[in-house]
A protein has these predicted regions:
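Phosphate/Mg2+-binding loops and adjacent switch elements
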Residues: 40, 54-55
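PAPS-dependent sulfotransferases, especially Golgi type II membrane carbohydrate sulfotransferases
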Residues: 43, 51-52, 60-109, 117-171
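Conserved phosphate-donor/acceptor-positioning beta-strand/loop module used by diverse small-molecule
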Residues: 7, 18-46
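Short, well-ordered alpha-helical microsegments
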Residues: 12-16, 22, 119
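Short, flexible loop/turn elements at secondary-structure junctions
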Residues: 9-10, 35, 114-116
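Glycine-rich phosphate-binding loop used to anchor ATP phosphates in small-molecule kinases
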Residues: 1-17
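Alpha-helical elements of the RecA-like P-loop NTPase motor core of helicases
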Residues: 13-16, 40, 124
Length: 171
């Protein structure tokens, strides 16, 4: 039976749509991480990727602040990310909506730190959730065959970068 894997932080709120489209039960893997760690990670990426002339766009957070005439600083960046039009709010709200609509049995939560600390154990849990057979993975020789254009999309060059070794790189 084919397995479709897609990523979108809003899928948790759209279970009936997904099931109507794929004509089978949806199973959604929900990555979770402490909010302070997410904010620190995004701020680190912003500081590591300063806007340069010729780039398609400024990072998506500062772009919003400039557009709304809000001073650019870390506090305002975090505030925007947590506001109803920010990506953290969007993710949290979509998950809440899915739970409120009774779809929590279709969700499997994967904590970032658990994945980094015990990747094979977490993947085994994911395989069990999906009804698939688990197999051993190598976490010291990773590659990404499908690069995303994060500069154009987010103004951040390494937002979805896959390192060759699975390890925590920022708090």
């Amino acid at each position: 039976k084919p397995v479709v894997i897609d990523k979108n932080r809003a899928w948790c709120a759209r279970v009936p749509f997904i099931e109507g489209y794929i004509k089978q039960e949806a199973k959604i893997i929900v990555p979770v991480r402490r909010i302070d760690e997410i904010l620190a990670s995004i701020l680190t990426m912003i500081k590591r990727n300063p806007f340069q002339e010729g780039q398609p766009r400024i990072n998506f957070v500062d772009e919003y602040l400039v557009k709304h005439n809000i001073p650019i600083n870390d506090e305002n960046r975090c505030q925007h990310l947590l506001n109803p039009d920010g990506i953290l709010w969007e993710s949290l709200n979509a998950t809440k909506l899915g739970v409120d609509e009774g779809h929590s049995d279709k969700f499997h939560y994967v904590d970032y730190n658990d994945l980094v600390n015990d990747p094979q154990g977490e993947l085994n849990k994911i395989y069990t959730f999906l009804g698939e057979e688990s197999f051993p993975h190598s976490f010291d020789n990773l590659s990404n065959q499908h690069r995303e254009d994060d500069i154009t999309t987010y103004g951040l060059g390494d937002m979805h970068e896959v390192h060759s070794k699975l390890e925590k790189t920022s708090s």
